[in-house]
């Protein structure tokens, strides 16, 4: 009996000790959790230090842990930046931008929150169907639009673009320029990894044309297909895409996703010249169509941004279509280079020497705050969000000091694309002529839409699509 009592006593002691240990542990965990959620107050908003919340593959694990502490309750402490276009897909995330913290979300229920300070729009998805109106004095509008006007023409007119306070576009004049969005680094331009010697290219010329064209977005506003069609009358061109198609790619390379495939690069690198024609003619709108041939060691024959000379690695690294009065003259020049190795290689000298002499390009790449396919850097959407966040906080601090807010506004040169023009020789092709009439008509129509949008937004109340179109066609 005594032994049984002793056993019960020992069991009771052990249970009590275990309970006491668990109680203390729970209290410690609770205190740690409370300390994680504390942040110093600045007026009604908080700007204390916060672990970076970056969307990079190398930091996913850290972000998962971080998100446990910074979720929707932050809307009571940090300014809200609401993506009106659901570009990021994030329902709620607190992001660190230097010393500032903002809450980013696509949840439109925050539209009327007193903490909402900015609305972010993606240009391609920008629609008049639903806008965050009425717009309060402290509501900034920010536009992210890296695409050509083909995606949303109305934004490229002064009445529409100047509705925004902050911009990230392909223009060098934008608040966050995305001009080099398709250029990974200066190093890829210098690299000789894909380059094929001219002697081998001469040998390959027995079965290849001197020029290659790869486009599947046909009948673009730039009228590029009309030019290439006329060029084909004067020189041989291998066309692998759906536009003016005359040569097949291997089956596994016919999908658009294969455009960055190493085997696709090998095919293009065999050519001496690549037709690098943009789908629209806009200042600073430069895509992979230029950077790809420069990377591969092929001479680009470029048609696009009128200011392209400002972005080329050297003064003699590309042939500019604008320098020739007719495709016939361009064909004659390319034939001359094709038959003269020394003159041809003059366009590749910069690459062979690794000598990029354009200070504007070097400076732009050095000062760029975002990376392309680089997990060690923020992407341009992160950088855009933080630019707006920092500016929002700048005005919060100015308000606390009793100062007037800083006013930012977009300018017409933040998206500068002139009216589309057809090549004069394209009139011989009826379908192409009617196509250009469509793009020109679209441009003229978009001017009316931009004006109508401005009128309705300045009323500062919601409007219907019927009201919008009545105003458009009233002009």
Swiss-Prot record:
Which Pfam families is this protein grouped with? Glyco_tran_10_N, Glyco_transf_10
Q: Name one GO molecular function term.
A: peptide-O-fucosyltransferase activity
Indicate whether Transferase appears among the record's keywords. Answer: yes
State where it is primarily located.
endoplasmic reticulum
Membrane disposition: Single-pass type II membrane protein
Q: What is its EC number?
A: 2.4.1.221
| Coiled-coil region | none
Per the record, what ranges lie on the membrane's Cytoplasmic side? 1-8
GO CC term (a single one): endoplasmic reticulum membrane
The UniProt catalytic activity note for this protein reads: L-threonyl-[protein] + GDP-beta-L-fucose = 3-O-(alpha-L-fucosyl)-L-threonyl-[protein] + GDP + H(+); L-seryl-[protein] + GDP-beta-L-fucose = 3-O-(alpha-L-fucosyl)-L-seryl-[protein] + GDP + H(+)
Q: Say which family it is in.
A: Belongs to the glycosyltransferase 10 family.
Describe the task this protein carries out.
Protein O-fucosyltransferase that specifically catalyzes O-fucosylation of serine or threonine residues in EMI domains of target proteins. Attaches fucose through an O-glycosidic linkage. O-fucosylation of EMI domain-containing proteins may be required for facilitating protein folding and secretion.
Please give the name of this protein.
GDP-fucose protein O-fucosyltransferase 3
What is the source species?
Gallus gallus (Chicken)
């Amino acid at each position: 009996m005594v032994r049984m009592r002793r056993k019960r006593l020992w069991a009771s002691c052990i249970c009590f000790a275990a309970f006491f240990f668990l109680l203390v542990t729970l209290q410690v965990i609770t205190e740690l959790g409370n300390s994680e959620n504390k942040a110093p107050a600045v007026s009604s908003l908080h700007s204390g230090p916060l672990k970076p919340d970056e969307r990079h593959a190398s930091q996913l694990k850290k972000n998962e842990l971080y998100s446990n502490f910074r979720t929707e309750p932050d809307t009571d402490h940090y300014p809200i930046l609401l993506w009106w276009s659901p570009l990021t897909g994030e329902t709620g995330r607190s992001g660190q931008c230097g010393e500032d913290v903002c809450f980013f979300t696509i949840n439109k229920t925050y539209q009327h929150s007193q903490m909402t300070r900015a609305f972010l729009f993606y240009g391609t998805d920008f629609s008049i169907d639903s806008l965050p109106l009425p717009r309060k004095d402290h509501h900034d509008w920010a536009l992210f639009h890296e695409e050509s006007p083909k995606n949303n023409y109305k934004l490229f007119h002064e009445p529409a673009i100047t509705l925004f306070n902050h911009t990230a576009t392909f223009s060098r004049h934008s608040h966050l320029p995305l001009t080099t969005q398709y250029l990974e680094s200066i190093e890829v331009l210098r690299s000789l990894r894909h380059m094929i010697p001219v002697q081998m290219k001469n040998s390959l010329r027995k079965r290849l044309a001197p020029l290659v064209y790869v486009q599947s977005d046909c009948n673009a506003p730039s009228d590029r297909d009309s030019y290439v069609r006329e060029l084909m009358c004067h020189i041989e061109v291998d066309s692998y895409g759906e536009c003016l198609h005359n040569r097949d790619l291997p089956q596994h390379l016919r999908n658009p996703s294969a455009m960055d495939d190493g085997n696709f690069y090998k095919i293009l690198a065999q050519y001496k010249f690549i037709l690098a024609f943009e789908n629209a003619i806009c200042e600073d709108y430069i895509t992979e169509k230029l950077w790809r041939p420069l990377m591969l060691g092929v001479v680009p024959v470029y048609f696009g941004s009128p200011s392209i000379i400002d972005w080329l690695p050297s003064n003699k690294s590309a042939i500019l279509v604008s320098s020739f009065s007719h495709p016939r003259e361009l064909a004659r020049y390319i034939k001359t280079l094709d038959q003269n190795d020394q003159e041809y290689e003059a366009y590749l000298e910069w690459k062979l020497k690794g000598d990029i002499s354009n200070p504007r390009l070097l400076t732009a790449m050095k000062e760029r705050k975002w990376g392309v396919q680089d997990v060690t850097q923020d992407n341009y959407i992160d950088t855009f969000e933080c630019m707006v966040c920092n500016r929002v906080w700048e005005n919060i601090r100015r308000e606390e000091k009793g100062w007037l807010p800083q006013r930012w506004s977009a300018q017409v040169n933040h998206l500068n694309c002139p009216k589309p023009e057809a090549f004069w020789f394209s009139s011989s092709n009826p379908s192409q002529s009617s196509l250009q009439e469509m793009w020109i008509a679209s441009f003229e129509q978009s001017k009316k839409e931009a004006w109508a949008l401005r009128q309705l937004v300045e009323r500062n109340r919601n409007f219907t699509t019927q009201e919008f179109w009545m105003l458009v066609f009233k002009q």
